[in-house]
């Protein structure tokens, strides 16, 4: 059975619009995916008919909103096959989830002389929090280097570990190169040294199923807005035993058990002690609708379609004169490229004139840009609603730009 891409496209109202008098070809889903009617309608219905502050409310609307929120926690736990819904913390997104781990688990467990391992392909969200932590603690940040094809030099990884390695923080899929890292092998090596493992799953969960129990990672984090859900909501998974030991990193309402001016404060149990203040309940409802949506289509079918489209795109783009493609042949979601010596911003601006939306810049991966010796790249993302025709338009646009700019 073929993937129903036209039916899927009909669910996304923004795909019906034009840009500069041409049909929109949205090739920027790795930055933020568009939203289907099912997500828009679910969040709208909540605000129209079901909104109330969650927790402790005795009235019907509050009780129903709280139940809806906790049902999404259960739904998200099934989505990544967590052992328990109480292993999931609602966060604003991947960035906040990583910072939570750094400022809670990291603050308690990293000591002077310890080390944390990351890779050269990481998003800044999985670099900067660890830099800040290491600077505060007197710890060392170690880096897995790259091969020219955009895969990690895994032969160097074993030498980076020692008895002071406390954490491996690694992206599941590179947001620039599309490289899917071999997590089982990397996690097994971390286990040999007693290190914990955090996985940045922001670019993975929309492309194929994720099973955190099978991975045996300690932390897994992703954002809703890249999964066709709302902005301002994400999921941090933490193994229950670890989560129960972690102290809160933000104080306020909802995360306490008792507060006394003379006796101090006691915390709520996890995960609620990590959810200070009024949550983004509407975003949580929208995230649940997004999970429902991709689950109903089947992540295996989505993945098969996207891989077929990726193969086609790589074949066609390789024929564009003076193009440089970055990353491995086998990849997920993104194609980074440059056209001759032209700056990525110029290429992206021309493509926008043709109604084609791509991302340009350093993609929050400046160390990776430095490794390739370029200030910026163009990046085209392929999502489940993209088509062969849109790939053809991208190729034609780049060919025309090459002809115009020389």
From Swiss-Prot:
<comment type="function">
    <text>Cysteine desulfurases mobilize the sulfur from L-cysteine to yield L-alanine, an essential step in sulfur metabolism for biosynthesis of a variety of sulfur-containing biomolecules. Component of the suf operon, which is activated and required under specific conditions such as oxidative stress and iron limitation. Acts as a potent selenocysteine lyase in vitro, that mobilizes selenium from L-selenocysteine. Selenocysteine lyase activity is however unsure in vivo.</text>
</comment>
<dbReference type="InterPro" id="IPR015421">
    <property type="entry name" value="PyrdxlP-dep_Trfase_major"/>
</dbReference>
<dbReference type="Pfam" id="PF00266">
    <property type="entry name" value="Aminotran_5"/>
</dbReference>
<comment type="pathway">
    <text>Cofactor biosynthesis; iron-sulfur cluster biosynthesis.</text>
</comment>
<keyword id="KW-0808">Transferase</keyword>
<protein>
    <recommendedName>
        <fullName>Cysteine desulfurase</fullName>
        <ecNumber>2.8.1.7</ecNumber>
        <ecNumber>4.4.1.16</ecNumber>
    </recommendedName>
</protein>
<keyword id="KW-0456">Lyase</keyword>
<dbReference type="InterPro" id="IPR015422">
    <property type="entry name" value="PyrdxlP-dep_Trfase_small"/>
</dbReference>
<dbReference type="InterPro" id="IPR010970">
    <property type="entry name" value="Cys_dSase_SufS"/>
</dbReference>
<dbReference type="InterPro" id="IPR020578">
    <property type="entry name" value="Aminotrans_V_PyrdxlP_BS"/>
</dbReference>
<feature type="modified residue" description="N6-(pyridoxal phosphate)lysine">
    <location>
        <position position="226"/>
    </location>
</feature>
<keyword id="KW-0663">Pyridoxal phosphate</keyword>
<keyword id="KW-0963">Cytoplasm</keyword>
<comment type="subunit">
    <text>Homodimer. Interacts with SufE and the SufBCD complex composed of SufB, SufC and SufD. The interaction with SufE is required to mediate the direct transfer of the sulfur atom from the S-sulfanylcysteine.</text>
</comment>
<comment type="similarity">
    <text>Belongs to the class-V pyridoxal-phosphate-dependent aminotransferase family. Csd subfamily.</text>
</comment>
<dbReference type="GO" id="GO:0030170">
    <property type="term" value="F:pyridoxal phosphate binding"/>
</dbReference>
<dbReference type="GO" id="GO:0031071">
    <property type="term" value="F:cysteine desulfurase activity"/>
</dbReference>
<dbReference type="GO" id="GO:0009000">
    <property type="term" value="F:selenocysteine lyase activity"/>
</dbReference>
<feature type="active site" description="Cysteine persulfide intermediate">
    <location>
        <position position="364"/>
    </location>
</feature>
<dbReference type="GO" id="GO:0005737">
    <property type="term" value="C:cytoplasm"/>
</dbReference>
<dbReference type="InterPro" id="IPR000192">
    <property type="entry name" value="Aminotrans_V_dom"/>
</dbReference>
<dbReference type="GO" id="GO:0006534">
    <property type="term" value="P:cysteine metabolic process"/>
</dbReference>
<dbReference type="InterPro" id="IPR015424">
    <property type="entry name" value="PyrdxlP-dep_Trfase"/>
</dbReference>
